[in-house]
Amino acid sequence: DVTFSLLGANTKSYAAFITNFRKDVASEKK
């Protein structure tokens, strides 16, 4: 299903966004 594929891609992008966001927050706290 195309919708499912898009959802999977969005989930991966969201996970990467959260990871990068946490890295940025950690960097600013130092």
UniProtKB/Swiss-Prot annotation:
Assigned keywords, A-Z: Glycoprotein, Hydrolase, Plant defense, Protein synthesis inhibitor, Toxin
Catalysed reactions, semicolon-separated: Endohydrolysis of the N-glycosidic bond at one specific adenosine on the 28S rRNA
Hydrolase listed as a keyword: yes
Biological process per Gene Ontology, one example term: negative regulation of translation
GO molecular function per UniProt: rRNA N-glycosylase activity; toxin activity
Domain of life according to the entry: Eukaryota
Post-translational modification: Glycosylated.
Residue ranges crossing the lipid bilayer per the database entry: none
Organism: Momordica cochinchinensis (Spiny bitter cucumber)
Enzyme Commission no: 3.2.2.22
Name of the protein in its database record: Ribosome-inactivating protein momorcochin-S
Keyword hit for Protein transport: no
InterPro entries per record: Ribosome-inact_prot_sf
Family: Belongs to the ribosome-inactivating protein family. Type 1 RIP subfamily.
Role noted for this protein: Inactivates eukaryotic 60S ribosomal subunits.
